[in-house]
């Protein structure tokens, strides 16, 4: 039976999930998880406590409980359950209070809510990424923080959206298609913003597999075409001295982190 895991918060539960997933990924096990956000009242906390206790009674095993709860009275109710508690906020807050000589002043939703100064930057960046996805328009390239280039299905769109959502970076992306291969060159709008360009490439066999799932047995998905496009685009990256990375078998989180590392782009918000 898969171990049971609860992610609980009086906010979005994003922090609890991120930390919990990071810890549990170290173990070669499958976990059955339940995320419960916005536990903001004593009544909700008591209900969550009952769920945790019911899980313990049913399985005979104490469920893992990862939580990031600001309100002490809510936190105490969760502490009193039969779960095995991992409290991320208090684990770090108490030692920091001692080191800094300042008492924490917890504010609910400060990390992810509108009170966060980066909220507007995040929304603007997300809108920018969607409006400038896949070369839909070249009008706003001057406003971009970053312009991702590459063949179709190499990871440009998810990387652009992730960078905008997580870091408030205005990321546009532009695809090179099979029609470009005979005379592959940078459009003028990209030449004007050459310092913002960053390339993504991918193993042709992996690209073939991805395209096959979308357009099976087409020229677009053929291994020959995939090899041609990857080769031509990589040659152009080298010719134009555009930095690039290989996205093969990397998660969007890893791709985004590598892009930030290579470019030195400042994260606009955390």
Swiss-Prot record:
Function: Bifunctional serine/threonine kinase and phosphorylase involved in the regulation of the phosphoenolpyruvate synthase (PEPS) by catalyzing its phosphorylation/dephosphorylation.
Pfam families listed in its UniProt record: Kinase-PPPase
Protein name: Putative phosphoenolpyruvate synthase regulatory protein
InterPro entries (UniProt xref): Kinase-pyrophosphorylase, PSRP
Catalytic activity: [pyruvate, water dikinase] + ADP = [pyruvate, water dikinase]-phosphate + AMP + H(+); [pyruvate, water dikinase]-phosphate + phosphate + H(+) = [pyruvate, water dikinase] + diphosphate
Matches recorded under HAMAP family: PSRP
Record key words, sorted: Kinase, Nucleotide-binding, Serine/threonine-protein kinase, Transferase
Gene source species: Shewanella oneidensis (strain ATCC 700550 / JCM 31522 / CIP 106686 / LMG 19005 / NCIMB 14063 / MR-1)
MF (Gene Ontology): ADP binding; ATP binding; phosphotransferase activity, phosphate group as acceptor; protein serine/threonine kinase activity
Sequence positions that bind ADP: 150-157
């Amino acid at each position: 039976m898969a171990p049971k895991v609860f992610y609980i918060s009086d906010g979005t539960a994003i922090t609890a999930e991120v930390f919990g997933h990071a810890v549990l990924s170290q173990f070669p096990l499958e976990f059955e998880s339940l995320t419960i956000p916005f536990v903001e009242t004593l009544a909700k906390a008591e209900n969550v406590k009952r769920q945790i206790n019911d899980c313990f009674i049913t399985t005979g095993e104490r469920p893992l409980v990862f939580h990031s709860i600001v309100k002490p009275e809510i936190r105490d109710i969760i502490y009193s359950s039969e779960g095995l508690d991992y409290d991320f906020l208090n684990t770090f807050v108490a030692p920091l209070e001692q080191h800094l000589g300042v008492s924490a002043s917890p504010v609910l939703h400060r990390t992810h809510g509108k009170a966060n100064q980066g909220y507007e930057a995040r929304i603007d960046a997300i809108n920018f990424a969607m409006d400038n996805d896949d070369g839909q328009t070249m009008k706003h390239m001057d406003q971009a923080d970053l312009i991702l280039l590459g063949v179709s299905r190499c990871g440009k769109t998810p990387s652009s959206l992730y960078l905008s959502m997580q870091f408030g970076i205005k990321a546009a992306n532009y695809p090179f298609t099979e029609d470009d291969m005979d005379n592959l060159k940078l459009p003028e709008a990209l030449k004007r913003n050459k310092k913002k360009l960053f390339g993504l490439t991918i193993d042709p066999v992996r690209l073939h597999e991805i395209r096959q799932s979308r357009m099976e047995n087409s020229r677009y998905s053929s291994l020959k075409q995939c090899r041609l496009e990857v080769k031509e685009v990589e040659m152009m990256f080298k010719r134009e001295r555009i930095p690039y990375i290989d996205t093969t078998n990397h998660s969007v989180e890893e791709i985004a982190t590598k892009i930030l590392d290579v470019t030195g782009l400042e994260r606009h918000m955390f």
